């Protein structure tokens, strides 16, 4: 029992030690336009968008059923994709990085402004992923 408590304590401490951030970039256009440019940038990296999550539509659709007010975001789309090369680098450095795959970029209306964003991972082993996400967003916002 004591070993389990110590293990859980260490796991909790490790989980809170590395905070990930979200990097946002303003976008002059619609979420549809931003999502198209993000998809084009992903394809430009030789990758495939595996799934597009229409989070804005889901929040709008379910708000009434939940007794919630207006959606906290306007239109919002999350594009999921993976890179075998980058994933292998990240997971060879730390196999636990499997938890971060697939990777995502998003476009959303937040506080009335369209933004493009992605997670920025704190772990050094995720540096190749951070570089890939930054390249994709840079290509979509240039």
How should these model regions be labeled?
Residues 57-104:
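Mid-chain, structured segments of secreted extracytoplasmic proteins
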């Amino acid at each position: 029992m004591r070993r389990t408590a110590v293990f859980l304590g260490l796991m909790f401490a490790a989980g809170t030690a590395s905070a990930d951030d979200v990097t946002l970039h303003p976008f002059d256009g619609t979420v549809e336009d931003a999502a198209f440019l993000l998809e084009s940038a992903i394809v430009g990296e030789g990758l495939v968008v595996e799934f597009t999550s229409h989070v804005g539509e889901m929040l709008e659709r379910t708000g009434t059923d939940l007794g919630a007010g207006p959606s906290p975001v306007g239109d919002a789309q999350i594009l999921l994709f993976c890179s075998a090369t980058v994933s292998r680098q990240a997971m060879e450095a730390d196999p636990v990085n499997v938890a971060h795959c697939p990777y995502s970029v998003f476009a959303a209306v937040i506080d009335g402004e369209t933004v493009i964003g992605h997670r920025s991972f704190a772990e050094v082993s995720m540096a190749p992923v951070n570089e890939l996400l930054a390249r994709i967003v840079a290509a979509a916002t240039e």
